[in-house]
Amino acid sequence: MSAKTDEILESLKSLSLLEASELVKQIEEAFGVSAAASAGVVMAAPGAAGGGEAAEEKTEFDVILESFEASAKIKVLKAVREATGLGLGDAKALVEAAPKLVKEGASKDDAEALKKAIEEVGGKVTIK
């Protein structure tokens, strides 16, 4: 690799999970691409080769914090921290930046449990 790509790689390694998520969003916007779309194409290809078989049920879901009641900010922040394992600063930045991806690639049960936990304390969540 060139020195420039080595430098970029080292910078990427030092990013927090929240920073990496924000970087992905910025790349998607800047280049007009979607990281999720490529995964969907890969998953759809085996079903298409099956010749008329029913589409497989989606197994991974993204949990998105859409908004929250101002009076419930601290409770929502705690629920997000518990679910993601983020530090206080990263969780606060995530909650304040709503709408924001909270958890990516969660199982259906985990996504539903996280949605319930956040909505019980005053947040509005969607699952995609």
Swiss-Prot record:
Matching entries from InterPro entries are given as:
Ribosomal_bL12 (IPR000206), Ribosomal_bL12_C (IPR013823), Ribosomal_bL12_C/ClpS-like (IPR014719), Ribosomal_bL12_oligo (IPR008932), Ribosomal_bL12_oligo_N_sf (IPR036235)
Pfam family example for this protein?
Ribosomal_L12_N
Q: Name one GO cellular component term.
A: cytosolic large ribosomal subunit
One GO term in the molecular function aspect is: mRNA binding
Q: Which residues form a coiled coil?
A: none
Any one biological process term the GO annotation gives: translation
Signal peptide region: none
SUPFAM superfamilies documented for this protein: ClpS-like, Ribosomal protein L7/12, oligomerisation (N-terminal) domain
- This protein's UniProt keywords: Ribonucleoprotein, Ribosomal protein
Q: What does this protein do?
A: Forms part of the ribosomal stalk which helps the ribosome interact with GTP-bound translation factors. Is thus essential for accurate translation.
* HAMAP family associated with the record: Ribosomal_bL12
Q: Which family does it belong to?
A: Belongs to the bacterial ribosomal protein bL12 family.
Assembly and partners are described as:
Homodimer. Part of the ribosomal stalk of the 50S ribosomal subunit. Forms a multimeric L10(L12)X complex, where L10 forms an elongated spine to which 2 to 4 L12 dimers bind in a sequential fashion. Binds GTP-bound translation factors.
NCBIfam families membership: L12
Q: What is this protein called?
A: Large ribosomal subunit protein bL12
Organism encoding this protein:
Synechococcus sp. (strain CC9902)
Its taxonomic placement starts with: Bacteria, Bacillati, Cyanobacteriota, Cyanophyceae, Synechococcales
